[in-house]
Regions:
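Extended non-catalytic scaffold regions that mediate assembly and binding
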Residues: 1-8, 13-59, 66-155, 165-250
Length: 250
């Protein structure tokens, strides 16, 4: 069982998961017929319609997970206070949360790669991501993070990004977290976080639990994932005014 994951792999998983989830939230509430929403021209148009929202929502969503990956809680609070004192914006906060120039440059590279793909009409596939995500320079010291914490942070990014995509595409009322979309997002997120190749589900026979166990790689990791889903769900209902009646957790 994987006990630790290198931070570059986690960073790449967080960024891809944000773009997959945020774009899915927007697309789920598109006026286009459901069977046509994922066509490249419609994906591209959906992202162009919300172009100005992407960076602000990205910074707001990714700051805490990045900071939690690199700092202790007390240090995060200090970083926020110091940034406020300097008048830093969210971009500046996120740069500080990266903790090193190399990690910040990796984040920027992943941001550009994922956003460019969506503007071209597609999300970066799991296989393409695992082949091409930004690695550390050869010979560089690479810090590791406990796999449990990495899973929790990734789940948080998926659910917050999806919810915020929904909110930006709903004019009135509470947006609905769609169960099928959330399952797909989490399957892909766990795949890119915990594996080095795209999962094949031929032997799962459409059994969702078997699919999740495959990408989570253990019952323990699956439990960590679902527990974080419950915690994040409660936050979304209270803070983001999300209607979660269609989710699997409640």
């Amino acid at each position: 069982m994987i006990m630790e994951i290198n931070k570059y792999k986690i960073l790449a998983a967080l960024v891809r998961s944000f773009f997959d989830a945020f774009s899915s939230g927007i697309i789920d509430n598109s006026d286009v017929a459901a069977e046509e929403r994922r066509q490249p021209k419609n994906v591209k148009q959906s992202m162009l319609n919300h172009y100005e929202h992407v960076a602000p929502v990205f910074f707001d969503t990714i700051f805490f997970p990045l900071a939690a990956m690199n700092f202790q809680y007390d240090d995060i609070m200090r970083i926020v206070r110091e940034a406020q004192g300097r008048g830093d914006d969210m971009h500046g906060l996120v740069k500080t949360a990266c903790a090193s120039d190399a990690m910040y440059e990796a984040m920027v590279a992943e941001y550009k790669r994922n956003f460019s793909a969506l503007l071209g009409g597609r999300c970066v596939s799991v296989a393409s991501h695992l082949e091409d995500y930004t690695r550390p320079a050869e010979g560089a010291d690479v810090e590791m993070l406990d796999a449990e914490r990495a899973i929790e942070l990734t789940v948080r990014v998926v659910m917050y990004a999806y919810a915020r995509g929904l909110r930006h595409s709903v004019a009135d009322g509470k947006p609905l977290l769609r169960q099928a979309t959330l399952f797909r997002l989490l399957l892909d997120a766990m795949n890119v976080l915990l594996s080095d190749e795209a999962a094949k589900y031929d032997d799962c026979e459409d059994d969702l639990a078997a699919m999740f166990l495959k990408v989570c790689q253990s019952q323990h990791n699956f439990t960590v994932m679902t527990s974080e889903m419950d915690r994040t769900y409660d936050e979304l209902v209270s803070k983001e005014e999300i209607d979660g009646n269609d989710t699997m957790t409640k």
